[in-house]
Structures are given as C-alpha cells and as structure tokens.
Amino acid sequence: MNQSLLAPFGTAIERVEAGLNALRQGLGVLVVDDEDRENEGDLIFAAESLTNAQMAMLIRECSGIVCLCLPDEKVKALALPPMVENNSSQYGTAFTVSIEAKVGVTTGVSAADRVTTIKTAIADHAKPSDLARPGHVYPLRAQPGGVLTRRGHTEGTIDLMQLAGLKPAGVLCEVTNPDGTMARLPEIIAFGALHNMPVLTIEDIVVYRKSLLANVG
C-alpha cells in the first residue's frame, strides 16, 4: 500500500479512529484492502443507521452489488445457506443466498426497499421467515476472528462496527470510476475528499486490533 498517499489521513491508528468516529455519527467510510489482494476500496456504512440517501449513493457511485456483512451467528439465526455449496471464488468471499424483506417492499430493488430489507434482517429478533429468498441484497458471512483471521472487507466491516460500539452489521459496495472501472487508491482518496469521508485500510484495522491486544496483554 502506498503509505505516502494515505499520510494526510494520519497514522494507521488515527485513520481507524477517524473511521470509527464517522461510523458513530452515521457517516460513511472508505476501506482499501491490500494491493496484492483485491486492490479495491469499499464504501461502508453502519447497517443500523443506513439511510435511503446513503443506499442511493452506494447504488449510484459503486458497483451496485450492495452487500450486508453479518457475523456467523446472525447468518445462522437467519438460516441463510451459502450461495453455493462449493465456494471456488478467488478469495472465498462468503456470499449467502440473496434476500428480500417479505413486508414493506415492492420490487425490492429501489434504495428504500433495499434499506427495508437490511433493517429487517438486522433486527434483534429477526426470524428466517421475515425474509424472502432470493432478493436484491447480498449477505456476506464474516469469519470469526475478523481481519486477524481473514483480511477481507467483510471482516473489516464487522470489526469496525464492533470497535465503534455499533450493532455488528455493515453495508458495503465496491467504489467504481465513472467509466465503470474499479477505483484504485488515488481515485478512492479523491472520492473521500469530495464526500468528506475518512480513508483507511484493512492493514490499519489489523494494526489497530493488534495494538488493543498488546495493551490488554
């Protein structure tokens, strides 16, 4: 990762702190993974405070494949099976079957409908019967252990929500350029500056979590 580009956002610890503060205020953050991995940046919002306007931004500015990151226990509680029996994707991204709220949506594809689906899924007492399958929201199952187990955006999202003291559920979508190509770090930093969003990396979250563990030790 080109640290010189990230320098204006502070140290790894400061970047994570800025991201946590933004999430607590109901704002978005941009998280970039390793250059030798997917090398992409995701726009992430806390699921519990997600607004229709934020969902519209995810649809408009990103790839359109809006995903709901959930911890393993929530995926089990909702009885969401894997999208495929044998996951052969390059990075083992743990998609479950797609979902739709059974109540309160029309076609399910509008920003408002997708927000309704997400709020239905993350409700404390949500039941499998509250959701139709398939739908227009794509849940992702986070590995237990977070980024210390798997350095993916899914795990990074859940880690950030937990570190911020929020419900462990986040919404993400990959940032794209206007021509449809994937945004890389320079474009993601420009996007963050335009929309006043903090930028941090998966590596930053790893450093932050390890520092917390060291302090506990």
UniProtKB/Swiss-Prot annotation:
Binding of D-ribulose 5-phosphate, residues: 37-38, 42, 150-154, 174
Residue numbers binding Mg(2+) 2: 38, 153
GO MF assignments: 3,4-dihydroxy-2-butanone-4-phosphate synthase activity; magnesium ion binding; manganese ion binding
Keywords: Lyase, Magnesium, Manganese, Metal-binding, Riboflavin biosynthesis
InterPro entries per the UniProt record, alphabetical: DHBP_synth_RibB-like_a/b_dom (IPR017945), DHBP_synthase_RibB (IPR000422)
Cofactor(s) annotated in UniProt: Mg(2+); Mn(2+)
Gene Ontology cellular component list: cytosol
Site annotation Essential for catalytic activity: residues: 136, 174
Gene3D superfamilies per record: DHBP synthase
Pathway annotation from the record: Cofactor biosynthesis; riboflavin biosynthesis; 2-hydroxy-3-oxobutyl phosphate from D-ribulose 5-phosphate: step 1/1
The EC number(s) this enzyme carries: 4.1.99.12
Cofactor note: Binds 2 divalent metal cations per subunit. Magnesium or manganese.
Residues that, per the record, bind Mg(2+) 1: 38
Catalytic activities: D-ribulose 5-phosphate = (2S)-2-hydroxy-3-oxobutyl phosphate + formate + H(+)
GO biological process, one term: riboflavin biosynthetic process
Family listed: Belongs to the DHBP synthase family.
Oligomeric and partner information: Homodimer.
Function statement: Catalyzes the conversion of D-ribulose 5-phosphate to formate and 3,4-dihydroxy-2-butanone 4-phosphate.
Name used for this protein in its record: 3,4-dihydroxy-2-butanone 4-phosphate synthase
